[in-house]
Regions:
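A glycine/proline-hinged amphipathic helix-loop "lid/cap" segment
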Residues: 1-61
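Alpha/beta-hydrolase superfamily serine-hydrolase fold, recognizing
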Residues: 53-60, 64-285
Length: 285
């Protein structure tokens, strides 16, 4: 991409003013993690949801559509699925002839990664027994989870999805490769991410591939499409992970938004429209 659009500049300015204060304050993120309530009640939305073994799953599009997309939402493992995810899932269903399923998974700090792995594994087993043309997709923390999950299912002899598509995935939950572009990221902060990452990992080590896919085995993973902005805190870690994927022989396409911020393909902008065209092209191959 070339010069950043005016719309994206305005969006970034707004994001800077609305950046959560706990992302840059150890005291505030610790307070958040000590007081945040669990998401036990169903999420309310105008969109339809179903129940899968006790897990709420939002659905978009025709159940008989040619393609199936499982979208694992981001939010640093503490933020619930939101309007941005709903709208993107709706767009996917309308433009890609896809039945989109978006699980509402347990969040930190009351829950940790192991619980979500169990729920998503059961859900995925049912899915691959009944549907074809499956794509696993996710943004930010959800993107990192998708990558870890696809590494994990190799160990239990479950089939890979047909493709993996992730936006700004959190690939190193321990943030082990400083320095990071903390000041320039209008959404995320290193201080907050480090503490949240510990909470999400629970009893697992921060370098356990199930929470940090950059440390996992990438051989024989499904083909991938990965997006990142070069002005986001995760850019360096994602770039390093993409190199590991290539070394391990994974068929990966890496798209970098010049001057762009975290999960930029999910925002309304010319850059996001260009990103969606790339996503759409994957469904025509």
């Amino acid at each position: 991409m070339s010069k950043k659009s005016f719309i994206s500049k305005i969006e970034e300015l707004i994001l800077n003013f609305t950046k959560p204060d706990y992302m840059d304050s150890k005291e505030k993120v610790e307070e958040l993690l000590s007081t945040k309530e669990s998401n036990e009640n169903p999420v309310k939305s105008i969109f339809k949801s179903i129940d899968s073994n006790g897990m709420q799953i939002f659905t978009f599009g025709d159940e008989n559509a040619e393609n199936t997309i499982v979208f694992i939402h981001g939010g640093a493992f503490i933020g619930e699925i939101n309007y941005q995810h709903f709208l993107y899932c709706y767009l996917l269903s309308r433009k890609l002839d896809a039945y989109v399923l978006a699980p509402v998974y347990p969040l930190a700090p009351k829950h940790s990664a192991n619980e979500t792995f169990e729920l998503i594994t059961d859900f995925y087993k049912d899915l691959i027994s009944s549907r074809n043309n499956i794509v696993l997709m996710g943004d930010s923390a959800g993107g990192g989870f998708v990558l870890s999950f696809c590494q994990y299912i190799k160990t239990i002899d479950l089939a890979q999805p047909d493709e993996i598509i992730v936006f700004s995935p959190w690939v190193d939950i321990g943030m082990s490769n400083p320095p990071y572009k903390n000041e320039s990221d209008p959404i995320l902060g290193e201080v907050g991410l480090r503490e949240i990452g510990k909470s999400w990992a629970g009893d697992w080590s921060l370098d356990d591939y199930r929470v940090s896919p950059t440390f996992g085995d990438n051989k024989n993973l499904a083909k991938m499409l990965i997006f990142a902005g070069d002005n986001e805190i995760f850019h360096k870690d994602i770039l390093s992970y993409v190199e590991k994927l290539k070394e391990d022989g994974v068929d990966v396409k890496f798209v970098v938004g010049e001057g762009m911020f975290h999960i930029y393909p999910l925002f309304p902008s010319p850059e996001a429209r260009a990103a969606f065209k790339i996503v759409k092209a994957e469904f025509k191959d």
